[in-house]
Amino acid sequence: MTGRAAAIALALLVWSSAGQTGTVRLDDTLTHTVPANVQMQWRPFVRGERDAGMEAWVRVNVRIDTREWMGRSGQVYLVLDSDDTSAMEAEWTTEGRLLAGRIRSGERTLVYWGTLTTATLDDQLVMRLRSLSDWRGSTRRLNFHFEFDTP
């Protein structure tokens, strides 16, 4: 391959990746929970309910690196991975940058739509986690991440 052909091939590769469409996982490594560890508590039993289950409250400081996608329009989704333990449900409020919502294990839900205008997408979620009483073990990791869908 000649130098000119290699330069053209490289330019096409860069151009095609800049126009990518589809779903990508976003870098949310700076997102963390406060406190880092939380103890699930038994929910009060309510007559007529089959299972009171367990719940916990946690604050999630969200910081998503969006530099690579600045200027692009699309939707950001929160994804709650499922695992081999009891199903988890999360419900949250926000400070306004992201959408409040509700999700169950194995699902994803919209938390932002529009053009990404900054290098990071920041917000704070106040999240209530709920699980049935069939949850076994003393610890469980809250496995969630964020995805960006582009048209």
What residue ranges belong to the model's regions?
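Bacterial N-terminal signal peptides that target proteins for export
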Residues: 1-7
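Hydrophobic alpha-helical targeting segments used for export or membrane insertion
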Residues: 8-12
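N-terminal signal peptide c-region/cleavage motif recognized by signal peptidases
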Residues: 14-18
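N-terminal small/polar-rich segments of proteins
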Residues: 19-85, 120-135, 139-141, 147-150
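Mid-chain, structured segments of secreted extracytoplasmic proteins
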Residues: 66-113
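Short flexible/disordered coil segments
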Residues: 94-98, 136, 143
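Extended, loop-rich substrate-binding clefts of extracytoplasmic carbohydrate-active enzymes
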Residues: 116
